[in-house]
From Swiss-Prot:
Gene3D superfamilies: 3.40.50.140, Bacterial Topoisomerase I, domain 1, Topoisomerase I, domain 2, Topoisomerase I, domain 3, Topoisomerase I, domain 4. Its cofactor is Mg(2+). The record marks H33, R160, D164, R342, R535 as: Interaction with DNA. Its EC number is 5.6.2.1. The gene is topA. NCBIfam families: topA_bact. GO terms for cellular component: chromosome. The active site is at Y340. This is DNA topoisomerase 1. Residues 150-604 form the Topo IA-type catalytic domain.
Amino acid sequence: MSKNLVVIESPNKVKTLQKYLPNDFEIVSTIGHIREMVHKNFGFNEADYSPVWEDWTKSKKKFSSLSFKGNLKGKKLLSKYDIIKSIKEKASKATNIYLATDPDREGEAISWHVYDVLDEKDKSKCQRITFNEITKNAVLDALKNPREIDQSWVQSQFARQILDRMIGFRLSRLLNNYLSAKSAGRVQSVALRFLEEREQEIRSFVPRFWWTLDVLLNPKAEGVREACANRSIPIVLREINPALRAGLKFEEEKSVSGIDFLDEASAKKFGEQLKGVFEVYNIDETKHYSSSPNSAYTTASLQKDAINKLGWSSKKVTLIAQHLYEGVSINGEQTALISYPRTDSTRLSAQFQQSCKEYILNHYGEKYLSNRIVSAKGKKGEKIIQDAHEAIHPTDINITPEMVKNAIKKDEFLLYRLIWIRTVASLMADCKKSHTHIRFINDGNKFYASSKSLVFDGYRKIYEHFENKESNDLYIDLDKIRVGDRFMAKDIKITARQTHPAARYTQASLIEALEKSNIGRPSTYNTMASVNLDRGYASLNKHAFHVTQLGEQVNEELSKHFGKIINKEFTKNMEKSLDEIAENKKNYQEFLRDFWSNFKEEVKLAEGSIQRVKKEKEFVGRDCPSCASPLLYRYTKRGNEKFVGCSNFPNCKYNEFSQNKPNLTLEKLEELCPECNSQLVKRRTKFNPNKTFVGCSNFPRCRYIKKDNAS
């Protein structure tokens, strides 16, 4: 019999964690949440706004006991009943019970649920422990410093769940009845509003057109020493001679760049007047400036970088980061490579900073060391850092990306390298640069060139070292130029320019925008960007969000009737209230009571005024071959594919896209998708039915294809 029982969430952690625990410790996994709120009455008691939990003894629905990775073959299917029963049996035999679920509010709530279902005699054995990384020191230190379950954190999680039910269930029912839309939600609907506002901004944008004139000087000029590194010198028009302005249409944009011609003819006319030499009449005083490295990753900044640099989806970033945290196989041994990946903190512990600085000192020298101390504050100290986590960082800075490159999967390596480099760079010295303006004159017309030099590479050194690429900055060294040097024009270039609307949101930029508005939490960033795709409210085209017609209708009605709730400020304040509940500054039941009483009235008003959208039937002009009823055009549930169906549906289920499209799925496999945990299937290719491949059954939501398997 094991004297000590450790309860965790994910079975993926078991092997990694077992390495650091004595033999008399047994680990059991909850495999996520063990209880959910009932669906009746939105899952809470309206008398006191406490959650009502389902009866776990009746929870018999089976699911895989498997983790996110691996093969289904030979694995037992479990229900929540099976899991809770097993935990209770093991708890009754243990001397000590350590509740070691994830170190956030959701993990705190799961620990409370485990505690709540235990027999009274076993509850006294329970202690709560947390660790931000699965390393020997972190785990053993947690065991030495157990605590009680934080009821404020638990209540904050209860409030979030009930709040999401209140808003999501009522609004979803309303949308489904009047718009045939799938759902609405506290955060997803605000994200949709972001997308729609950007869509309207793009549609209403009126571009401004202008022309610029740039001159390229020949570096091989008389009196110029060593030909200025033998490169042509680009100069920008800054001021036009008053005597030459007649007939020219232009604007002076001195605060930006220089002269903007309002038509091409004016630019050409001026260009034809440029004759003779361009002489240096002044060199401005050199300005020195520095650029500091970015802080170590938060969940949001990791999402943004991985989506942009690796081309991944938000869901994939979340999944691979979880693998690295829970432990990956390195030479047959499970090793956790990064700290907890759901955090909005940029803090690094003093101990970790010291080990990282020792690495920098040993590999790059003292001049590359930063003297900054990374504090627990967020960006500019504006944001409350949830639960005082650390930033995402490697568990051991001495495990470099190159050391594990051939031992772990490619995707795991790519994300680990991103995290490792960013962490080390955050503690390196600033990059130092210099900037000088060189002034030229030609027939009273004034131009300037910018001389940029890299003085000290600082933190950029590590990016060049590990990513094998230089900075994107273009450095032009014109130090050899002196006042009085004379040049001839090599080329005069006239360029048509125009302003452009703001770019459509990508998954990365939407997460960044929501995070800057203090909307959502690290655990929800993954779904915030994707849920509107799943509901058919938006589509992705070349990685950019486009709002569908259904999405526009949903946003319009929500903004019209629930504008006080579905907006940035309300959602931001709601997150703040949840933080205050977690800090024991606000009572969660009073908070919910105040919200619910007002929200119910708004729903009643909306039900009396919202317009039911009637979709005009679009008939094909021929009858159904199965039942002779008229055929009409329909749309799939997600609203993104048109097909021909019978008007007598559901009595007649004839449709033509299933008639015209062959069944591409051949068989389901006993293997899970490594990206979304759905079952893999064997399929025929679309254009060659004789060729097969293995892909995800969750297509098109997940587009994973197993490589090297086509036949």
